[in-house]
């Protein structure tokens, strides 16, 4: 298996968001929050590690930006 690193933590945070706000499903129809927050979480769980946010800090900043723009 792959080493546990920052991108693994990003994935885990995204998966946790889907557990809390999507009933463990990743489809938009199950997501309880805004499209903006959905896209932040969906990016975090991308199978292509290079497409995920590069760090938990970057994930948090994207999440906060989505909240600040009234997309929650």
What are these regions (language model features)?
Residues 20-25:
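Hydrophobic anchor on a C-lobe helix of Hanks-type protein kinase catalytic domains
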Residues 50-71:
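Terminal C-lobe "cap" of eukaryotic-type protein kinase domains
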């Amino acid at each position: 298996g792959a080493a546990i690193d920052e991108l693994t933590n990003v994935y885990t945070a995204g998966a946790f968001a889907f557990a809390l706000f999507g009933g463990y499903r990743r489809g938009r129809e199950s997501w309880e929050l805004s499209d903006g927050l959905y896209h932040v979480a969906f990016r975090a769980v991308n199978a292509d590690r290079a497409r995920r946010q590069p760090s938990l800090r970057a994930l948090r900043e994207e999440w906060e930006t989505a909240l600040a723009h009234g997309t929650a």
